[in-house]
Amino acid sequence: MKTDIVIIGAGPVGIFTAFQAGMLDMRCHIIDVLDQAGGQCTALYPEKPIYDIPGYPVITAQKLIEQLMEQSSPFKPVYHLSQKVEKISNNEGESFTVITNIGTEVKCKAVIVAAGNGMFKPNRPPLSGILEYENKSVFYSVNKISDFQDKTIVIAGGGDSAADWTVELSKVAKKIYVIHRRKEFRCTPETRNKLESLEIDGKIELVVPYQLHELAGGNGQLSAVIVKNIASKEEKEISADFLLPFFGLSMNLGPINNWGIQLEHSRIVVDPATLKTSRDRIYAIGDIAIYSGKLKLILNGFAESAMACYDIYKVIHNSPVNFQYSTSKGIHGKEKLP
């Protein structure tokens, strides 16, 4: 198989890159270790609302992925899902062969790594017997908000995920208890204000400074969560239907460590002007890329995608792009607006 660009990672930034490359008449293959496109957006929080996508006051993660796939579809990107890139070999004539764990080989002129946080898994709290409850009444992500209708939920954690899901699930849950080791939450001031309002209204209860201590129940069904005060060691039992621990993700760059690319703090170091890595014709964009002043935002990843694609075009064709706005260029198969 041959193409212009191999994109490693089928998250929102990777999918958008197929569109951006297509606008420059470059073909793409996209490889991802997950069994469906969307990255964390579909794997961990498909119903989570996103508020900072231009033109959308609010859009769910799943809907964003669907829209991005529709946007890129005229350019017919080829997806290789449930596959992990093991090796990127240099060929003669300034090209690569990208090889996956199941033997798929794709020859290309450039590679864009849009692998997000790499291979990830949620951090599991050290609670005895927790495996019995996982995927039954203990979950590390929210796939369907309706599953929590009129339920009592314990949410553990003090970051954005814990705070954001507390706000969202408070719309359907009977009661939410938020367990955190500290009084301060690592979330936006606006979200913190919402938490305080929800607590005043009795929709949630902030249980601080406490940590998870023990689970009670049987046959995979939780009946209570026991928490312990950090200072006094006092224990408190909270009746609950579900526990949602949000303690972040464990990153594993896996084979990326062996690709001969400069890394820093488990990220790929890039030139912020071009998104080039230390290896010629290999680029990195989105959360996996690091440079001074980096903002880990989806919209920033979209901009990085455009910058990388324009530089790749210049490298491949040995000349800069003859720039055209999308309104002038149009998209094959799509009618221009009158």
UniProtKB/Swiss-Prot annotation:
Answer yes or no on keyword Transmembrane helix. Answer: no
Question: Per its UniProt entry, what is the enzyme's top EC class, as one word?
Answer: oxidoreductase
State the HAMAP family in the record: FENR2
In this chain, FAD is annotated as bound at: D32, Q40, Y45, V85, F120, D287, T327
Regarding protein family, the annotation reads:
Belongs to the ferredoxin--NADP reductase type 2 family.
Cofactors needed by this protein, per the record, are:
FAD
What's the protein here called?
Ferredoxin--NADP reductase
List the taxonomic lineage.
Bacteria, Pseudomonadati, Pseudomonadota, Alphaproteobacteria, Rickettsiales
**Signal peptide extent:** none
Which Pfam family is one of those matched by this entry? Pyr_redox_2
Its UniProt entry gives the catalysed reaction(s) as:
2 reduced [2Fe-2S]-[ferredoxin] + NADP(+) + H(+) = 2 oxidized [2Fe-2S]-[ferredoxin] + NADPH
Q: Does the keyword NADP apply?
A: yes
The cofactor binding remark recorded in the entry reads: Binds 1 FAD per subunit.
> Might you give the EC number(s) for this enzyme?
1.18.1.2
Spell out the molecular function terms from Gene Ontology. ferredoxin-NADP+ reductase activity; flavin adenine dinucleotide binding; NADP binding
Q: Which UniProt keywords apply?
A: FAD, Flavoprotein, NADP, Oxidoreductase
What quaternary structure, including any partners, is listed in this protein's UniProt entry? Homodimer.
